[in-house]
Amino acid sequence: MDGRGILSEFANVRCHCGQVMNQLATMLEPVDAASCDQGEGGFLKGGADRFLVSDDLRVMPGLSSQCLMLLKNLSIMDAKELESQSMNIGPEEILQLLRSSLLSKTPLTHWIWLKQGASDLMELELNNMAESLDKTSATSDSKKMSLKLFISKSREQVLYAESGEDFADLLFSFLTFPLGSILKLLGGKSLLGCVDNLYGSVKDLSTDNYLKSDELKNMLLCPKLAPFFACENQLLHVEESSSPQYLLYSNGKPNNKWFVRPLTTESNVSSLGEGLGPLSMVNPKSSTGETTGGGGYVKGPAKFMVTDALVVTQLSPISSISFLGKLDVPITDVDEKVVQVGEEEALNLLKAALISETALTDVFNLTDKSVLE
């Protein structure tokens, strides 16, 4: 913090003056947080009926008609075939179920098998999903970035790509996207386990009887990026949350402790005393204490090597030749091709990154001879 009113949640961030920010302050909750519904931090309305969750994670109202329809779809005609089990769910079980939902088409079955000590067979399903990778079309291609591909002519496979910091930032930005935003970009068709069914379930549940509000429904279907997480050359349109302003307080005692609280209409009413002044959050990607968005994750100017499996490393002549040696690819078999990456290619890269280990080859479709020529 300094006289220009900035703060950061990250260590070693630099102020406008060029010095590292080193004054510590305690972050407090907003004073009007008590006005929120206590104990109701979820998305569903309290007192709603029970829900029915199928093995492929379709969430439905717990109605008899839905239950009978599910049994009919599963070709279960005799109720004597069914038995009930009670399961205790803790943090470990939740992590297992999350992983199963991303990799398996039957995550509840896999989850129960794992609980019973069975081996993990989900990698087979992941490979099957990668084989069915299709292409996603974008609505516009307003921006493009160049990418040089190094291709094995005999294998019709991308060995690696040579890129600038813009393409590296694009790939790294995939790690910042909320899962709901990824599914929205892909039209709810990610092929990723059963999360498409979860996404569709939220779409189908009404705010009249089940979800608390349209705002919360939209939060699930189209969540925003955290403040300052968007890149300057963003090809995919995921909205970024705005960063709130904060208010600085001092306890006025000899030890002079500082406190920070989100700025609200009631922030000046505090047991800490009157607020000393507003503060704005620093963009952690800025080296000069800027509070506006933008910027990237990697330093430039720089060149990067991106493998077919999306491993990003610093490019050098030695590293590229060594990589070709590891792949046992003769230099005479290597061809170069410059391609353009726009919104459509970025969407397909995002999808391939989720389900394929040959993302560059899959996206740039080397069966198209125009790429190989």
Language-model-derived ranges and their functions:
Residues 1-373:
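Long, position-biased, composition-driven segments near the start of the mature protein
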